[in-house]
A protein has these predicted regions:
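Short, structured beta/alpha segment
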Residues: 1-134, 412, 432, 453-454, ...
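Short, well-ordered beta-strand elements within core beta-sheets of diverse protein domains
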Residues: 78-83, 97-104, 180, 199, ...
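Short, flexible/disordered intra-domain loops and linkers
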Residues: 236, 351-362
Length: 553
């Protein structure tokens, strides 16, 4: 008998499965705030404000120890929110108990429970937006979209793909083999057996969007999860976990299928969990160094690490619109997106456009002007840049000075009229030569390198080598040469890097759409997993077949 919540959400699940196969645009969660209830913004803001300087309830029970150190990048003051601090072994013990029940919960029941939790989260999108804004530094609109509709899309995608994979084979059948004068009949069962307890490690810049794919993939496949958020960005994922636990409680299922494990910067606990023998699965977003350590633990590990994203600018229909697109992509959230471009490779002889040949200096001039026009715009500038999440981001960039190149645009003095104390920085633009090593490392945050190359072939060679050795989540190319376009596609795809060609207008390299785009390929050093393909799901469980002779039935 189907769970009532499965029946309630079956139509949506069916639509999501179809969308996965068709790869067309699909979302049950519109991304614009105006699509939601009038008054939702005020209610969400009020709900967020009420939680400031309080203990966050709803993510654990019976705990008296509380910690928290979140700071708003806009206010430059602490939020004062405290979260329950629990002993790791006790958390794992509770996860083990919950696993024994959850793994035996039917596939349909799991799907219904999980989709219902997303519908509950939907009612808190505005609160989530303010929580995200004041922990990550994203603008309000980006916070609303990334932690609300877009995160829900990714979670639903994981549920749908999980449901599909779990039903790949029949649950039970009678297998008959003709043997001449008689038939051999066996009863066979096929069980997707979950691996156990998963650890989902969040990041400080996208605390829900990057967390929910692994979390919901774990839960859908019968595993339980411990979520270890970044200590500076806890509240957004705490809201989601609260709703998940509420739905479980209402349906007489263990709330501890998902638990929040918090720590501080000075007293981290991630390694305690990661190295524990009961942790079987790890999902991680963050630096390559820590990601490499996690992968070395020899557990089932799904990583999104750092990479060096590049653009090759060989020719373009319109240089101005091209540079405007690049400037926005590099400025969005001050370059703190894993999909943001860092390097632009340009032939030293310039590029062809519909208006004729543009020399290298003209390309630089158009790019810097586009960047300056965007970030100094009184409305577009602050909303595009957002705020810097971590002080160290600016410290690391400032420490590099001119990066050994020629600075053609310094960081500009940008202010946000709504938040006078906001930590804001526009991208610095630096020109380098192709022989320099500087651009071959990731510099997280507001910096953009323009690399002067001998020709387009050297540019492509450098980009390919970078993707293969350092990893790349995105790659963008501008060319009017169809043969060269094909060559770029073949060369970059051979190192498992996707390419976005000739983006302009509202199409930006930063954006990956759920149900259509794969986020990270899993084939280069930027990460070993992809949101959301079959491999992202079916490594979380093992197919086990049992056989029964008729007289044992």
């Amino acid at each position: 008998m189907s769970h009532p919540l499965f029946k309630k959400h079956q139509a949506l699940l069916d639509q999501a499965i179809i969308a996965l196969k068709e790869r067309k645009f699909f979302t049950p969660y519109p991304e614009h705030p105006k699509a939601y209830e009038e008054g939702g913004n005020e209610e969400g803001k009020a709900s967020f404000s009420k939680k400031l300087n309080t203990n966050y309830l709803g993510v654990a029970e019976g705990n008296s120890d509380w910690i928290g150190e979140e700071i708003s990048p806009y206010w430059q003051t602490g939020l004062g929110i405290q979260y329950p601090k629990e002993n790791p072994q006790e958390v794992i013990n509770k996860a083990k108990s919950a696993f024994e029940i959850w793994k035996n919960t039917s596939i349909k029941s799991r799907a219904g429970i999980l989709i219902e939790s997303l519908e509950r989260v939907k009612s808190r999108f505005f609160e989530l937006a303010y929580a995200t804004m004041h922990t990550t530094g994203q603008s309000f609109l980006m916070s609303f979209q990334a932690s609300g509709p877009h995160a829900n899309d990714r979670a639903l995608e994981a549920i749908a793909k999980g449901y599909e994979e779990l039903l790949e084979y029949p649950e039970e059948l009678t297998w008959t083999k003709p043997m001449g004068k008689f038939d051999l009949a066996l009863k066979k069962t096929f069980k997707p057996v979950p691996k156990g307890i998963g650890l989902v490690i969040g990041c400080s810049t996208f605390p829900t969007w990057n967390t929910v794919p692994g979390l919901f993939a774990n839960l859908m496949t019968g595993n339980v999860s411990i979520v270890k958020p970044h200590p500076k960005a806890i509240m957004p994922i705490a809201i989601l976990i609260e709703e998940l636990r509420n739905v479980c409680k209402e349906n007489k299922l263990p709330e501890d299928i998902v638990q929040l494990a918090v720590d501080t910067v000075k007293e981290p606990i991630t390694k305690i969990y990661a190295e524990h023998s009961e942790i079987k699965l790890i999902d991680y977003t963050g630096s390559s160094s820590f990601g490499d350590y996690l992968e070395g633990l020899q557990k089932t590990c799904f990583t999104e690490k750092s990479g060096v994203n590049s653009i090759i600018l060989e020719s373009a229909q319109d240089l101005k619109s091209t540079c405007q697109n690049i400037a926005f992509s590099a400025s969005l959230y001050s370059g703190q997106m894993c999909t943001a471009p860092q390097n632009i490779f340009v032939p030293e002889t310039g590029i062809e456009t519909k208006e004729g040949k543009m020399n290298f200096e003209e390309v630089l001039s158009t790019l810097t002007q586009s960047m300056e026009n965007l970030v100094t715009h009184p409305k577009m500038g602050p909303g595009t840049l957002g705020a810097i999440q971590n002080d160290n981001t600016l410290v690391n960039i400032d420490a590099q000075g001119d990066f050994g190149g020629k600075v053609i645009l310094e960081q500009l003095n940008i202010s946000n009229p709504e938040f006078a104390s906001a930590r804001i920085a526009s991208p610095k633009i630096v020109v380098l030569n192709a022989t320099q090593a500087t651009y071959q490392e990731e510099f997280f945050g507001p910096v953009l390198f323009v690399i002067k190359c001998k020709n387009k072939l050297e540019a492509l060679q450098k980009i390919k080598e970078l993707a293969e050795s350092k990893g790349a989540i995105t790659c963008s190319a501008y060319t009017l040469d169809e043969a060269f376009e094909k060559k770029i596609e073949e060369e970059m795809n051979s190192v498992f890097t996707p390419v976005s060609f000739n983006f302009s207008g509202p199409a930006f390299i930063n954006q990956h759409a759920a149900f259509s785009d794969f986020h990270v390929t899993g084939g280069n050093p930027a990460g070993n997993a992809s949101f959301t393909n079959s491999n992202f799901i079916n490594r979380r469980f093992v197919w086990v077949g049992n056989r029964y002779m008729p007289n044992t039935l």
